[in-house]
Amino acid sequence: MSRSNELLQGTLDLLILKVLTPGPMHGLAIADRVRQLSEDVLRVNQSALYPALHRLEHQAWVKAEWGESENNRRAKFYSLTRAGHARLKTEEKSWERLSSAVHGVLRSV
Protein backbone atom coordinates (compact mmCIF):
# COMPACT_ATOMS: atom_id res chain seq x y z
CA MET A 1 0.00 0.00 0.00
CA SER A 2 1.40 3.41 -0.93
CA ARG A 3 1.56 6.28 1.52
CA SER A 4 -1.12 8.20 -0.39
CA ASN A 5 -3.44 5.21 0.00
CA GLU A 6 -2.74 5.08 3.74
CA LEU A 7 -3.62 8.75 4.03
CA LEU A 8 -6.70 8.20 1.88
CA GLN A 9 -8.11 5.58 4.24
CA GLY A 10 -8.21 8.12 7.06
CA THR A 11 -9.88 10.80 4.93
CA LEU A 12 -12.13 8.84 2.59
CA ASP A 13 -15.41 9.91 4.20
CA LEU A 14 -14.39 13.57 3.98
CA LEU A 15 -13.37 13.20 0.33
CA ILE A 16 -16.61 11.46 -0.63
CA LEU A 17 -18.76 14.05 1.14
CA LYS A 18 -16.85 16.89 -0.51
CA VAL A 19 -17.00 15.37 -4.00
CA LEU A 20 -20.78 14.92 -3.65
CA THR A 21 -21.32 18.61 -2.82
CA PRO A 22 -22.20 19.67 -6.40
CA GLY A 23 -24.78 16.91 -6.81
CA PRO A 24 -25.50 13.18 -7.15
CA MET A 25 -22.86 10.83 -8.55
CA HIS A 26 -22.48 7.10 -9.00
CA GLY A 27 -19.60 5.23 -7.39
CA LEU A 28 -17.25 5.13 -10.37
CA ALA A 29 -17.76 8.86 -10.96
CA ILE A 30 -16.92 9.56 -7.30
CA ALA A 31 -13.66 7.62 -7.58
CA ASP A 32 -12.82 9.30 -10.89
CA ARG A 33 -13.50 12.76 -9.46
CA VAL A 34 -11.24 12.18 -6.44
CA ARG A 35 -8.48 10.99 -8.78
CA GLN A 36 -9.00 13.96 -11.10
CA LEU A 37 -9.09 16.60 -8.35
CA SER A 38 -6.00 15.13 -6.68
CA GLU A 39 -4.16 15.14 -10.01
CA ASP A 40 -3.82 11.34 -9.98
CA VAL A 41 -2.32 11.21 -6.48
CA LEU A 42 -5.35 9.67 -4.74
CA ARG A 43 -6.98 6.58 -6.18
CA VAL A 44 -10.05 5.13 -4.51
CA ASN A 45 -10.45 1.38 -4.97
CA GLN A 46 -13.94 -0.10 -5.18
CA SER A 47 -13.06 -2.29 -2.20
CA ALA A 48 -12.74 0.88 -0.09
CA LEU A 49 -15.31 3.08 -1.83
CA TYR A 50 -18.46 0.99 -1.56
CA PRO A 51 -18.09 0.08 2.13
CA ALA A 52 -17.52 3.79 2.81
CA LEU A 53 -20.63 4.74 0.82
CA HIS A 54 -22.69 2.15 2.71
CA ARG A 55 -21.32 3.47 6.01
CA LEU A 56 -22.19 7.05 5.04
CA GLU A 57 -25.64 5.93 3.94
CA HIS A 58 -26.16 4.09 7.24
CA GLN A 59 -25.22 7.31 9.08
CA ALA A 60 -27.81 9.15 6.92
CA TRP A 61 -25.12 11.47 5.54
CA VAL A 62 -25.74 10.30 1.98
CA LYS A 63 -28.77 8.81 0.30
CA ALA A 64 -28.76 6.45 -2.65
CA GLU A 65 -31.19 6.24 -5.54
CA TRP A 66 -31.14 4.11 -8.66
CA GLY A 67 -30.80 5.95 -11.93
CA GLU A 68 -29.26 5.76 -15.37
CA SER A 69 -25.58 6.55 -15.91
CA GLU A 70 -24.17 8.51 -18.83
CA ASN A 71 -23.66 5.23 -20.73
CA ASN A 72 -27.33 4.24 -20.22
CA ARG A 73 -26.59 1.67 -17.53
CA ARG A 74 -28.47 1.32 -14.30
CA ALA A 75 -26.40 2.72 -11.43
CA LYS A 76 -26.85 3.78 -7.83
CA PHE A 77 -26.44 7.54 -7.45
CA TYR A 78 -25.35 8.98 -4.12
CA SER A 79 -26.17 12.46 -2.87
CA LEU A 80 -25.61 14.44 0.31
CA THR A 81 -28.41 14.76 2.81
CA ARG A 82 -28.90 17.80 5.03
CA ALA A 83 -27.11 15.87 7.79
CA GLY A 84 -24.34 15.08 5.30
CA HIS A 85 -23.80 18.77 4.57
CA ALA A 86 -23.53 19.42 8.31
CA ARG A 87 -21.12 16.51 8.75
CA LEU A 88 -18.99 17.79 5.88
CA LYS A 89 -18.57 21.14 7.64
CA THR A 90 -17.50 19.34 10.83
CA GLU A 91 -15.08 17.09 8.95
CA GLU A 92 -13.58 20.03 7.05
CA LYS A 93 -12.93 21.91 10.31
CA SER A 94 -11.30 18.82 11.83
CA TRP A 95 -9.14 18.34 8.74
CA GLU A 96 -8.05 22.00 8.76
CA ARG A 97 -7.08 21.71 12.42
CA LEU A 98 -5.14 18.49 11.83
CA SER A 99 -3.36 19.70 8.70
CA SER A 100 -2.44 22.97 10.43
CA ALA A 101 -0.97 21.05 13.36
CA VAL A 102 1.06 18.79 11.05
CA HIS A 103 2.24 21.82 9.09
CA GLY A 104 3.33 23.47 12.35
CA VAL A 105 5.42 20.46 13.31
CA LEU A 106 6.99 20.20 9.85
CA ARG A 107 7.92 23.90 9.85
CA SER A 108 9.51 23.84 13.30
CA VAL A 109 11.67 20.74 13.18
Residue positions per predicted region:
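Accessory beta->alpha helical hairpin/"wing" motif in late/C-terminal subdomains of nucleic-acid enzymes
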Residues: 80-84
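Absolute protein N-terminus
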Residues: 1-2, 109
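Basic amphipathic alpha-helical segments that dock to polyanions
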Residues: 49-56
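Short beta-strand/turn micro-motifs at beta-sheet edges
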Residues: 2-6, 66-67
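Beta-hairpin "wing" of winged helix-turn-helix
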Residues: 57-74, 79
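N-terminal helix-turn-helix DNA-binding core of bacterial DNA-binding proteins
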Residues: 5-48
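Amphipathic alpha-helical dimerization/coiled-coil segments
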Residues: 85-109
